[in-house]
Design a protein with these regions (language model features):
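Thiol/selenol-based redox catalytic cores and closely related redox-interacting motifs
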Residues: 33-113
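Local sequence-structure signature of Cys/Sec-based thiol-disulfide redox active-site neighborhoods
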Residues: 1-24, 28-33
Length: 113
């Protein structure tokens, strides 16, 4: 397995995801989205695997001003705006090769080989 966890250090679900893999002795790479974020290619790949751009956005997040802009701008501009503002992406984003999840989903991770 080649696990990557994209999240923030303050996110409780990200901490729980890290604990899940640590407890099972599974190595993972943590990417702090406040420092690095996701590349456009990574984001598009994860979005496709999880039902599209709209599902990637945490609409209940703290940054309501940015979320309002994303909600009402043209569809072709949304991707760039989300990539510029990684704080609006649901976390954790957990990747294992081409598979990925949004949020804390241990039942899915248990099935990964």
């Amino acid at each position: 397995m080649n696990i990557q966890i994209f999240g923030t250090k303050k996110c409780n679900d990200t901490k729980k995801a890290e604990r899940f893999f640590k407890e099972r002795g599974i190595k993972y790479q943590f990417i702090n989205m406040k420092e690095k974020g996701m590349s456009k290619g990574e984001f598009v790949s994860v979005a496709q695997a999880n039902g599209g751009l709209e599902n990637m956005i945490n609409w209940e997040g703290k940054d309501q001003d940015t979320l309002a802009i994303i909600k009402y701008i043209a569809d072709e501009d949304k991707l760039e705006k989300v990539l510029e503002n990684p704080q609006v992406i649901k976390t954790p984003v957990v990747r294992n090769g081409k598979q990925s999840t949004l949020g804390y989903q241990p039942d899915v991770w248990k099935r990964w080989n």
